Every structure is written in C-alpha cells, then in structure tokens.
Amino acid sequence: MNVLHDHEACATRAEVLLVLLPGAHMAPEELQREGFVQAVRRRGLAVDMALVDSHLGYVYDGSLFERLHQDVLAPARAQGWQRIWLAGISLGGYAAMGYAMRNPGMVEGIFTIAPYLGRQPLVQEIASARAQGRSLQQWLAGSQPRNDIDTDHALWRWLVQRPQDGPALHLAYGVDDRFAAGHALMAQTLPAARVSTAPGGHDWPPWRTLWAQWLDQGLLPQRCRT
C-alpha cells in the first residue's frame, strides 16, 4: 500500500501514530486538500500521521486487512509507535473496524466518520429486528452469516459483542447521510459520548466539522515526548 507520511509534530517520533483511511474512490491526497492534516497541525497535536491508499482494489481481491497489517500497522509497531489510532471515512471506517476486529490489541482507538456498515440487506435486517422490539443481542442470536468469510456479518457481531478491553470506538455522521439508518443502529452499541452528528449528508462539509469536533475532544496528546 502507498502511504503519505506527515511527521512534523515533534523533533523525534511522536508518541501516537494517527492512520487515516480514505473512502471508496478517494485518494489520500484528498484528505490533505480537504484540510484534515492541517486541522491536526493547527491544534498542535503531537501525533505523526499516515494517510493510506487503501483503495477498492484491495477490497475486491480480499487483501485489504492483510495489506493494512503487513504494509502499515505491523511496520509502525516495529518502528516504535506503541499508540496507534485509526480514523476512516466511509469505506475507510469499515476498514478500520474490520482491521481492529481481526487484530486485537493493535490499535488504541478508532474514529469512524460515516462508516460503510456492510450490505444494505443486512442493515435492513437489523433495523427490522429493532423495529419489532428485539435487541441487537437477540437479532444476533437468530442471525447467520452467508458464509465463512462474511465480513459484514462478522463486523456487526463484533460491534454487538465488542470486548470491554477493545479499542475505544467513536462514530460521527451527518444526519442526512444516506447511510444514517445504519449509523443510528451502530450508535446503539456505543456510549452516547462517543457518538456525534452534524447537519449534512455523505460529503465533505459535515465530515470536516465532525473531524474538528473530534480533534477538540482531547483524546490525542498535545505535547511531544522529551
């Protein structure tokens, strides 16, 4: 995977590596053009950044999570970053959660912006169960994956049964996003403090707003190690 690096925060390696995963049909350079890197730097946050070209080709050939591990996360750990956060937009949010699901203990936290949450029939199945008064746990008990490699179903199982010692998971989305119904279901698996919304749809204006709000929560260090 191609990776754009931004290591301007500290004289030496920062304590935290923030890995940004773009959405489908989106290049890492777009995250730069839309001000995501600049927003981090304006706040003086002491993090190194890696913008990953996790494009759809890796999804189509089934190598997305393995390539993230071999090309990005495992080398980052080997180079000394022990605190790693993933931040993903749309398909990038799906990739971030799917990676954490498959690699326990590798990341400290995940920030998902308008994440893709799997095929629509599955999301509709979950929504129907909730509308009938069944809990997410009850839905899960009666639901079966399509096959042994049904990542969409596995992701929802992970969301519903996420371990207490797993990575901190945050969700943000526009209230008019075309996937907002799925986001509202995902929000039911999270503490309210880890869910934020903004006016707008599946587009950059709400994403920029939500990114800024998340950066201002104080989750990332503001001082470099001495």
Predicted regions and their residues:
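Non-catalytic cap/lid and distal C-terminal segments of serine-dependent acyl enzymes
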Residues: 1-226
